[in-house]
Amino acid sequence: YSAALKREAAGGQKRSAADDQDTKIRRNKQRVLLLPSRGITTRMRHLVNDIEALLPHSKKDSKLDSKSDLSVLNELSELNNCNNCMYFEARRHEDLYLWLSKTPNGPSAKLQVQNIHTMDELKMTGNCLKGSRHILSFDKGFDAAPHWQLMREMLTQMFAVPRTARRAKPFIDHVLSFSILDGKI
């Protein structure tokens, strides 16, 4: 701003359109609220912790009572300054459902989580830096139908770490791959 004032005082001209666009840099402030329900098992809890470790732009909140209305998620997201929400709902201590929602008035999707394997039991001994960003890779099946295109966009907004995230490191050292097989992601 001071450089623009010096230019204006020296040249007597106003700031150019390029200077105006420099001041209006669009910031990607995507934040994801991770929220488990009551009654999740230890394996499900470890899955939530693994996803939290993968997403440096996420905020984890305490467990939510599953009997409550799901519209509470919008209020919790707003209180935590998050515009995306991942809610892990456990039913009968067996089934795990993942709600993806773009809060407050965006689309939402309910996914059933099958075959849970945590990073500890798979012995992932890679050298990924904690908080580093990742590349998202999508199968070309996501371009086949409109509902898959919507899922691709939702997954991109949930898992893409913004460059300006608070805890994100400036390195890219791993890839998250999403593919469709037998109608499942």
Positions of PLM-derived features:
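Phospho-regulatory, Ser/Thr- and acidic-rich intrinsically disordered linkers and terminal tails
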Residues: Y1-I185
